Amino acid sequence: ASQLAGDEVYIWGSLVNLKNPWYGRVDYYHQDFANYKPRGYTKPSVVNCFTFLDQHNINNAPLNIFPGSHKEGLLDHLSVFDVNGMHKLVVDPKDLNRAYKKYGHKVIEAEPGDVLYFHSLLIHGSGHNSSPNPRMIILTQVNPKKNKPVESLSKIKEFNLSRAQKEIEQAKLRYEFYKNKYEKQLK
């Protein structure tokens, strides 16, 4: 990872990405750096490492990438709420179309134990798991030690708070919608 990042790195974050059989959430096309920049990072130097724990194939929501798209820099992202009401930043469709024409699209099929490294500007995403098999990845993000956030901690907290407030507002709207729908059914 240090060779890819060009400097000594530290683990910036990690998570388990699980897509349960028959559904699992959709991860719309995005660039990870779109989420890092508002947190004060000025350089898209974070390297993602996906360790595949299950077989990944066309049926169980494999990772989809636009190979080489990281060369485009940070693209325009739209602020949307997914089907679960979670706030997401997604690549503008006009940029997706342009990247598709220039770089193409690749479905990543992998076996358990395979590892994939990719740049935080690479366009990627995945769909629903439409199979009876789970799909799990361990994502480890490494960041060069020199790539420190320039914003103060209070600015980062403000960003996180505003994002959480948007999600709460959306949850309230969904609650009212379904409450009203349920009450109409009772009448």
Label every model-predicted segment.
Residues A1-I65, H70:
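Conserved double-stranded beta-helix
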Residues I58-I123:
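Double-stranded beta-helix
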Residues P112-Y117, L121-K187:
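Non-heme Fe(II)/2-oxoglutarate
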Residues K19-P21, I58-N59, G73-L74, G125-G127, ...:
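Short catalytic/ligand-binding loop motif for oxyanion handling, primarily in non-cytosolic enzymes
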Residues H30-A34, L89-K102, P134, L153-E158:
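Short, surface-exposed loop/helix-turn segments at secondary-structure junctions
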Residues S2-Y10, V107-E111, K181-K187:
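N-terminal auxiliary "cap/dimerization" subdomain that precedes the catalytic jelly-roll/cupin core
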Residues D32-A34, F52-D54, G68-H70, L78, ...:
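Histidine- and/or cysteine-centered catalytic micro-motif in compact active-site loops
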Residues Y28, N48-F52, H105-V107, V115-Y117, ...:
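Conserved hydrophobic/aromatic beta-strand scaffold that supports enzyme active sites
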